[in-house]
């Protein structure tokens, strides 16, 4: 295969390498300034540990540019422009390396990612308190010898981590697999809050870093020539850099296991791959969505009887969660918090916007506000659940080979994000990682668009700027992206169906014209 980096284009290979290097350098500078601003505890860009002080290289931009005393309005403007510039450079980098498979480009991408890690891993919690909940769930086991699925933080108000926890009345909503690293980290860190935070951030960093070679390897086989494009999508995404590295979210561990399962499946270890993805779903349950296309592909495989293969897959899909939950399964109450979370609405979700407008109509017809909210939320939940089910079935019907399996999985994650009532920026990680190695397609474009929009999810606002109701700046653009994606995907599938029908008709006509003996 010819080296696509030398194909004729506007930019020569050497110039392209220099441009990618320049984008890497500028991205590092932007993230450095962002982290430096965030270290000022008065600016509320991060969730800090009381009394913590930061120094060294992390604070240099703040001192050099005199950012410590900036106003709240200036903080918002700087942060906004940093996000805009970082997303623009990310998209330009994707375009530049889309057909460039040179190792030198891979090294530049990986080197920049390493610097991003240094900037965020050793800083405070960036725009999220989730790690403080992780610490409490670990301490539930190591300190209180309790079940993290049953013990809520409010039951231990004198615990050292309690003042920092955001969800004080919620037990763990994560799977049993996450309990083990949580136990290990909190056991080692003890009562040292900073060490606990660093432990979970290092777990996120190691997991995130492990994803990149897997994405590169899969891209090399699924979409040859697009390896570096996959690498820059996965490694330079502002959402993933800020929230996986800065926020230390366990989504990194989940997606690392998920990609590991897809890697095993691609290598021919089919049931093992399905089992590992089920383990990923025992970190966060949403990863189970990636199993559906694998099951369709596994059952459709012509090796062996379909029913026998379906039975084997069912044993794995049911057996793995049962075995992993057994040590914690004292009663079905362990799922109470997860059930509660499934009814919540976040401001940026599309269902939140629809429910909000529907409530206005119901209140206008004379219904009380409380009843209108209950009725609207229930009906909107059912509506979007039906939309998710229909589109998912259509996507699963398209699974015919490994690439279409990965595309279906990334499409399902996109539809889940669009139809879910509670969404946060880092929920896009699964879809981004999967679509990264499938090359350029409509789903890749939609995932990139959604991630750019949701990188603006938490712009630090000056006092008095916050407003209630749905976040239309997030949900309306997401609706537009979803509609465009549905139109293009629908047109593509309709064209393919017509072509298949035409092929069948032509084959039937040929059989009539040339009958067999």
Which residue ranges define each predicted feature?
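Membrane-water interface signatures at transmembrane helix termini and the short loops
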Residues: 128, 228-262, 283, 289-292, ...
């Amino acid at each position: 295969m010819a080296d696509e980096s030398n194909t004729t284009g506007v930019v020569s290979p050497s110039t392209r390498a220099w441009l990618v290097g320049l984008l890497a350098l500028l991205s590092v500078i932007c993230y450095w300034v962002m982290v430096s601003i965030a270290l000022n505890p008065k600016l509320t860009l991060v969730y800090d540990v009381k009394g913590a002080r930061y120094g060294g290289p992390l604070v240099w931009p703040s001192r050099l540019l005199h950012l410590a005393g900036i106003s709240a309005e200036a903080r918002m403007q700087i942060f906004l422009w940093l996000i805009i510039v970082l997303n623009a450079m990310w998209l330009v980098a994707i375009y530049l390396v889309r057909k460039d498979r040179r190792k030198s480009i891979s090294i530049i991408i990986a080197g920049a990612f390493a610097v991003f890690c240094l900037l965020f891993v050793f800083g405070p919690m960036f725009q999220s308190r989730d790690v403080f909940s992780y610490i409490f769930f670990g301490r539930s086991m190591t300190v209180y010898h309790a079940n993290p699925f049953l013990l809520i933080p409010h039951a231990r108000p004198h615990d050292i981590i309690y003042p920092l926890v955001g969800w004080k009345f919620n037990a763990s909503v994560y799977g049993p697999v996450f309990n083990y690293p949580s136990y290990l980290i909190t056991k080692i860190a003890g009562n040292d809050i900073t060490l606990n935070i660093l432990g979970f951030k290092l777990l996120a960093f190691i997991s995130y870093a492990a994803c990149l070679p897997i994405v590169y390897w899969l891209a090399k086989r699924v979409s040859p020539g697009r390896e570096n494009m996959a690498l820059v999508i996965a490694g330079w995404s502002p959402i993933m850099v800020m929230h996986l590295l800065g926020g230390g979210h366990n989504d990194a561990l989940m997606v690392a296991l998920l990609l590991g399962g897809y890697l095993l499946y691609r290598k021919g270890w089919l049931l093992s791959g399905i089992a590992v993805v089920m383990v990923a779903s025992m970190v966060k349950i949403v990863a189970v969505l990636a199993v559906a296309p694998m099951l369709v592909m596994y059952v459709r495989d012509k090796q062996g009887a379909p029913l026998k293969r379906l039975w084997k897959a069912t044993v794995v899909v049911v057996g793995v969660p049962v075995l992993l939950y057994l040590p914690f399964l004292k009663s079905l109450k362990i799922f109470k918090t997860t059930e509660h979370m499934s009814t919540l609405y976040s401001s940026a979700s599309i269902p939140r916007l629809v429910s909000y407008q529907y409530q206005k109509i119901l209140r206008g017809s004379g219904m009380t506000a409380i009843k209108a909210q209950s009725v609207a939320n229930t009906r909107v939940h059912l509506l979007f659940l039906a939309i998710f089910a229909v589109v998912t079935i259509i996507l699963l019907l398209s699974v015919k080979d490994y690439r279409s399996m990965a595309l279906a999985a990334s499409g399902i994650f996109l539809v889940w994000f669009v139809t879910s009532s509670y969404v946060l920026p880092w929920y896009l990680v699964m879809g981004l990682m999967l679509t990264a190695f499938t090359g350029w397609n409509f789903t890749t474009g939609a995932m990139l668009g959604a991630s750019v929009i949701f990188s603006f999810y938490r712009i630090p606002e000056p006092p008095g700027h916050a407003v209630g109701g749905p976040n239309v700046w997030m949900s309306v653009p997401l609706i537009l992206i979803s509609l465009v994606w549905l139109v293009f995907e629908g047109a593509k599938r309709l064209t393919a169906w017509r072509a298949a029908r035409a092929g069948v008709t032509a084959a039937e006509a040929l059989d009539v014209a040339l009958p067999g003996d």
